[in-house]
Swiss-Prot record:
EC class name: translocase
Domain of life, source organism: Eukaryota
Name used for this protein in its record: NADH-ubiquinone oxidoreductase chain 4
Gene: MT-ND4
Function statement: Core subunit of the mitochondrial membrane respiratory chain NADH dehydrogenase (Complex I) that is believed to belong to the minimal assembly required for catalysis. Complex I functions in the transfer of electrons from NADH to the respiratory chain. The immediate electron acceptor for the enzyme is believed to be ubiquinone.
Enzyme Commission numbers on file: 7.1.1.2
Topology versus the membrane: Multi-pass membrane protein
GO BP terms, alphabetized: ATP synthesis coupled electron transport; electron transport coupled proton transport
Compartment annotation: Mitochondrion membrane
Keyword Mitochondrion: yes
Family the UniProt entry places it in: Belongs to the complex I subunit 4 family.
GO molecular function per UniProt: NADH dehydrogenase (ubiquinone) activity; ubiquinone binding
Main subcellular location of this protein, as a coarse class: mitochondrion
Residue spans crossing the bilayer: 1-21, 34-54, 63-85, 89-111, 128-148, 156-176
Length: 231
């Protein structure tokens, strides 16, 4: 069920990050070096999840692994125990909650019309559903974290916190962001561009689907213009 995937990615996955934040409050703040293995594992796990996204052919699996990779950045930022790292982790959890939920919603919109989640079988939707393609583009750009979205603000805070803690981490973080941009563009091009493989008539997008996407994108845009509300 798509509703379960949306709630899982947007809310339940973030409860783990919230639990880590609460647990870190009772840890000694001066002993950041003891968390070095966890930070390295979190960043390496984010890269591996991103690489797994690149070889996925199932649309929902790709989005799910994308959520895993972003949570790796969140864990690494929380472990540093700095104000910038904590703000970046909180902001990324909220931003990615909206983004991943919107991606699952769009995946369901595609599935209802093609009855498949295989990327290569869902191509050519920009000719059939141009408004849905617009939503796909906006959501993928937010997943890539381009400015001035809140995703960009959060990743910039996390990058600054990690770099000030250990400059070497910029290599792992930069590689993770590069792969994120690669699979996000691959997902958009695979589902929207190219010749369509559908022979039957496809129903247009409904008002409820546009309303659902608006309720995902609009709050994210508004918080992006005033990020101090959550930081």
């Amino acid at each position: 069920p798509i509703a379960g995937s949306m709630v899982l990615a947007a809310i339940l996955l973030k409860l783990g990050g919230y639990g880590i934040i609460r647990m870190m409050q009772i840890m000694p703040t001066t002993k950041t070096d003891m968390f070095l293995p966890f930070i390295v594992l979190a960043l390496w796990g984010a890269i591996l999840a991103n690489l797994t996204c690149l070889q996925q052919t199932d649309l929902k699996s790709l989005i799910a692994y994308s959520s895993v990779s972003h949570m790796g950045l969140v864990v690494a930022a929380i472990m540093i125990q700095t104000p910038w790292g904590l703000s970046g982790a909180m902001t990324l959890m909220i931003a990615h909650g909206f983004t991943s939920s919107a991606l699952f919603c769009l995946a369901n919109t595609t599935y209802e019309r093609t009855h498949t989640r295989i990327l290569i079988l869902t191509r050519g939707f920009h000719n059939i559903l141009p408004m849905a393609t617009t939503w796909w583009l906006l959501t993928n750009l937010m997943n890539i974290a381009i400015p001035p979205t809140m995703n960009f603000t959060s990743e910039l805070l996390i990058m600054s916190a990690l770099f000030s803690w250990c400059p070497t981490t910029i290599i792992l973080l930069g590689l993770s962001m590069l792969i994120t941009a690669s699979y996000s563009l691959h997902m958009f091009l695979s589902t929207q561009m190219g010749p369509t493989l559908l022979n039957n008539q496809t129903e247009p997008t409904h008002s409820r689907e546009h309303l659902l996407m608006t309720l995902h994108i609009t709050p994210l845009m508004m918080i992006s213009m005033k990020p101090e509300l959550i930081m």
